[in-house]
Amino acid sequence: MKKIFTIVALALCTFALSAQNVERTMEFEGTTRKYMEHIPATPNGSMPVLFQLHGLGDNCNNFSQLGFEALAPNWIIITPEATEATISIMGIYNMNAGTAWAAGVGGENLSYSGFNIGDINLNEGVNDEGFILAILDSLENNFDINTDSIFITGFSMGGFMSNKMAVKHADRITAIASVSGTLGHFQPFEPTGNINTMHIHGTSDETISYANADFNFNGIAVQVGLGAEALVETWRNYNQCSTEPIVYNFEDTKNDGLTFEQYTYKNEETGNKTVFIKVNGGVHTWYEAARNDIDYTTEIYKFFTGQENVPTSIESNVAENFSIYPNPAANIVNVKTDRNAELSIFNATGKEVKHISTNGNTTSIDISELPNGLYFIVANGIAQKLTIER
């Protein structure tokens, strides 16, 4: 369930030492909890808040680099870290499961190496939902927060935790987007209110299976929650959305062996919606525009901000796809777009450092004055990561 980011040009300490991206700790219920905090350099009015929840065994430093800062420079972005979990084997041996959210993930009457080890509910006694809400309370007390724009996204186990927060705290959370993680086996579906939800899942996911959320870990096989389609139907039904979705097929332009389908279910009276992106052939990872037909970060941002994917005419001047090369780059980066586009380059703190207009062909951009590090090139709302390395 751990997502591994291969960003070699930006050391994790760069984020920790940045004026806008800092590592924080909070004393919560007798435990020192850790999280990464990104505050806009120049706030403009009330700020939305986004929580990013990592997968099993991951950490907040690693997962803080999804790239939302480039798309949403006025958002506060918080990446909390889960606590370590252990699995007791017959009370004799404790197996370290890595960092895990108390999201109701587990199963009943499980066996390991031929021995019955009973029920497992990872980190059952940890109050992770209280920790997340305590961070939100602190932000509301210290900043001008847009309380109508509180979002959570999570990958794998972070997706399970996102759905738990949606079920239990719709009064505080505006919308969630879960990726490769559904609703945990031990988490009852008893929502406190309607909430917009998005789910993204690959049909070939072997870590959290598409059909039944089957999970295999160190020889322990268990169904840990709802399958992908069952989760979407559960939220669609609760939100009383139409049974007939708006279907959007993403253009298949990359040679990645994948196709992406989006299903949007709406409740026209309340405005609530449930969105599902089905990744045919997709596995347990976070897909990005550099190599794939869509970029998860961009699609989640569009969902949170109410932007919808609709078919565009051939005359549209919006760059539907663009590529960058070389990447990493040293002094020159080439940007190829299929239509006219406005390009912006943002640094890792979300500050725009360059803006260029293109004519739909290949544009060479001089980046020699920019220091080494992680950047984001954004073309009409679509972002790609760029590493500058010399």
Segments from the language model and where they lie:
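Short beta-strand/loop motif that positions the catalytic acidic residue
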Residues: 199-201, 205
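Acidic catalytic loop of the alpha/beta-hydrolase fold
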Residues: 205-208, 284-286
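Catalytic active-site module of serine/aspartate enzymes centered on a nucleophile-bearing elbow/loop
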Residues: 293-310
